[in-house]
Amino acid sequence: RTGTKLFNTALAASGLVIASVDFRLAPDHSYPAQVEDVSYAIRWLKAHASEFKASPDSIGGAGASSGGHTLMLAAMRPDDPRYTVLSSPDVEGHDGTFAYAIAEFPVLDSYARYQYAISDGYDRLVASTNNYFLNEDAMQEGNPQGILDRDEDADLPPLLILQGTADLNIPMSIPRAFAQSYRIAGGDVELEEFPEMPHRFIEEASDATDKALELAKAFVARQLAT
């Protein structure tokens, strides 16, 4: 929530209503707790949109790194009963669909990223993935790329992916493959690559961060204009 404060504050300054969502984290809470929280948050925001002078139909989402993974699962499976278990009277009648999504250096293929971490000796990523999913069956099931590969009936909101090419956490093959699969499935996706930028590059002020911000603002403006 605080890591992308610089980026989100700049988006808010452009006139967008920004809500920063907390969700449960591993290892204390394994998958799908994180997606449950985000699913509830989008429904709560729709229920209370008028309080923020926002329209329920214009609410999108953004997520960075593992938050991008959580975002995409919530966006692609807005009505999945595994994710909609949290409820309250005020959210009844509101769905979990997203008008658009912005995924910042996201984990779009959790299983492929796990195999990459093992092969390259990234023990921290291996451990965090195991803590998150607990087993490889869950890793395959809770996998945005897997949803597309299995030809599941998925929601495909307009999507902007922001990815640095020097990201040691995310090999470029993953976002490139996902973008191709998303298009084939009928989704509208823009993959923007930032040469020599590392993981979480938008957390620091730079020309690349400025460019990413302008791309994000233009992307949202296009979605709200339709």
Each language-model region and where it sits:
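Short beta-strand/loop motif that positions the catalytic acidic residue
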Residues: 155, 160-163, 167
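Catalytic histidine-centered segment of alpha/beta-hydrolase-like enzymes
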Residues: 197-209
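Short amphipathic alpha-helix adjacent to the substrate-entry channel of hydrolases
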Residues: 2-20
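Conserved alpha/beta-hydrolase "acid-adjacent" motif
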Residues: 168-177
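Alpha/beta-hydrolase active-site loop
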Residues: 29-51
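Catalytic active-site module of serine/aspartate enzymes centered on a nucleophile-bearing elbow/loop
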Residues: 207-226
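Primarily recognizes the serine-hydrolase "nucleophile elbow" in alpha/beta-hydrolase
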Residues: 43-116
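Mobile cap/lid helix-loop segments that gate and shape the active-site cleft of serine hydrolases
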Residues: 76, 83-84, 88, 112-150
